[in-house]
Swiss-Prot record:
Function according to Swiss-Prot or TrEMBL: Component of the Pelota-HBS1L complex, a complex that recognizes stalled ribosomes and triggers the No-Go Decay (NGD) pathway. In the Pelota-HBS1L complex, PELO recognizes ribosomes stalled at the 3' end of an mRNA and engages stalled ribosomes by destabilizing mRNA in the mRNA channel. Following mRNA extraction from stalled ribosomes by the SKI complex, the Pelota-HBS1L complex promotes recruitment of ABCE1, which drives the disassembly of stalled ribosomes, followed by degradation of damaged mRNAs as part of the NGD pathway.
Compartment(s) where it occurs, according to its Swiss-Prot or TrEMBL record: Cytoplasm
Any one of the GO BP annotations: ribosome disassembly
Organism: Pongo abelii
Modified-residue entries (Phosphoserine), positions: 374, 380-382
Database matches in InterPro entries: eFR1_2_sf (IPR042226), eRF1_1_Pelota (IPR005140), eRF1_2 (IPR005141), eRF1_3 (IPR005142), Pelota/DOM34_N (IPR038069), Ribosomal_eL30-like_sf (IPR029064), Transl-rel_pelota (IPR004405)
Cofactor: a divalent metal cation
Primary localization: cytoplasm
A GO MF term: metal ion binding
Location of cross-link Glycyl lysine isopeptide (Lys-Gly) (interchain with G-Cter in SUMO2): 162
Assembly mode: Component of the Pelota-HBS1L complex, also named Dom34-Hbs1 complex, composed of PELO and HBS1L. Interacts with PINK1. Interacts with ABCE1. Interacts with CNOT4.
Similarity field: Belongs to the eukaryotic release factor 1 family. Pelota subfamily.
Protein's recorded name: Protein pelota homolog
Length: 385
């Protein structure tokens, strides 16, 4: 994401102009735009025209509109963002108050104005515009006949390809059908890797599986690369890291990222930090339950006692339609930071973020036990905030 202009007043009202450059920037934008904001961007509008002879026709024109935002729709697979609202500035083609939907486009700037820019939103802009926050991990999670090729970016886990091939069982004295199907499966996975992984950006490619599938696959891939003189694979061989996974399904990626070998290799990535924080929370819940709590009310009480060491919070909570509720989460984040606590904002599009959402989306590891919390502990997961 490129920051063109930022103009925010002392009362935190103001506007920023940004240019989305990567598909992931649409996800950042989705987390920035809220109902009631005003969005100015280039868009296509179908307009009716009347010729001198009186015949009526229609054509599509490009124009710039400013909308008061009423609805936001994000397609996570296509990374497309549509913003619906009413026109609030005079325009040659669109009446004031008329509805329109802008589909934000890569490499076209937009200007977003808010009455109140909070700290969480401003931090997201800072992160989105920092080139160090780019996609740098890929993963091939596989078992015999099934593979998922994923990109692990700082904000989301994207499934780029799913490969499925029926592998017949080995028969006594005749393994040829099994071996041919397995080779066909491996070849399709290799093709998917070359098609979907940008080797110039990705620092590490995890190949994870149960049993010996990963070793057999990597042996096949590099033997074929030598035979065909595939420089792309041979030059990037050192980036491939083989690790254990319980299955070839996407959910196995969480356990892969928890693997100590992987964690040390990916220690500088946000995704690995999220996974470790959630893992630490679960360990504390098991071994020191008086220092691990989840649910907004419990976590707020812990914060009042200045007991929070690490706050785990899902980014979907900052998209809450109710401004007062959203502000409550922002105040919690600001307060934990002021008290020298660590804040981990989890992406709801990461496997770890999905798990945190099942724990109400907010949890905390405490510096010390808070007796009142332990006494009053109830089923936090039933809270509806």
């Amino acid at each position: 994401m490129k920051l063109v202009r930022k103009n925010i007043e002392k009362d935190n009202a103001g506007q920023v102009t940004l240019v989305p450059e990567e598909p992931e920037d649409m996800w950042h934008t989705y987390n920035l735009v809220q109902v009631g904001d005003s969005l100015r961007a280039s868009t296509i509008r179908k307009v009716q025209t009347e010729s001198s002879t009186g015949s009526v026709g229609s054509n599509r024109v490009r124009t710039t509109l400013t909308l008061c935002v009423e609805a936001i729709d994000f397609d996570s697979q296509a990374c497309q963002l549509r913003v619906k609202g009413t026109n609030i500035q005079e325009n040659e083609y669109v009446k004031m108050g008329a509805y329109h939907t802008i589909e934000l486009e890569p490499n076209r700037q937009f200007t977003l104005a808010k009455k109140q820019w909070d700290s969480v939103v401003l931090e997201r802009i800072e992160q989105a515009c920092d080139p160090a926050w780019s996609a740098d991990v890929a993963a091939v999670v596989m078992q015999e006949g099934l593979a998922h090729i994923c990109l692990v970016t700082p904000s989301m886990t994207l499934t780029r390809a799913k490969v499925e091939v029926n592998i017949p069982r080995k028969r006594k004295g005749n393994c040829s059908q099994h071996d041919r199907a397995l080779e066909r499966f491996y070849e399709q996975v290799v093709q998917a890797i070359q098609r979907h992984i940008h080797f110039d950006v990705v620092k590490c490619i995890l190949v994870a599986s149960p049993g010996f599938v990963r070793e057999q696959f990597c042996d096949y891939m590099f033997q074929q690369a030598v035979k065909t003189d595939n420089k792309l694979l041979l030059e990037n061989r050192s980036k491939f890291l083989q690790v254990h996974a319980s299955s070839g399904h996407k959910y196995s990626l969480k356990e892969v990222l928890c693997d100590p070998t992987v964690a040390s290799r990916l220690s500088d990535t946000k995704a690995a930090g999220e996974v470790k924080a959630l893992d630490d929370f679960y360990k504390m819940l098991q071994h020191g339950p008086d220092r691990a709590f989840y649910g907004l009310k419990q976590v707020e009480k812990a914060n009042e006692a200045m007991a929070i060491d690490t706050l785990l919070i899902s980014d979907e909570l900052f998209r809450h339609q109710d401004v007062a509720t959203r502000s409550r989460y922002v105040r919690l984040v600001d307060s934990v930071k002021e008290n020298a606590g660590t804040v981990r904002i989890f992406s709801s599009l990461h496997v770890s973020g999905e798990q945190l959402s099942q724990l109400t989306g907010v949890a905390a590891i405490l510096r010390f036990p808070v007796p009142e919390l332990s006494d009053q502990e109830d089923d936090s997961s039933s809270e509806e905030d």
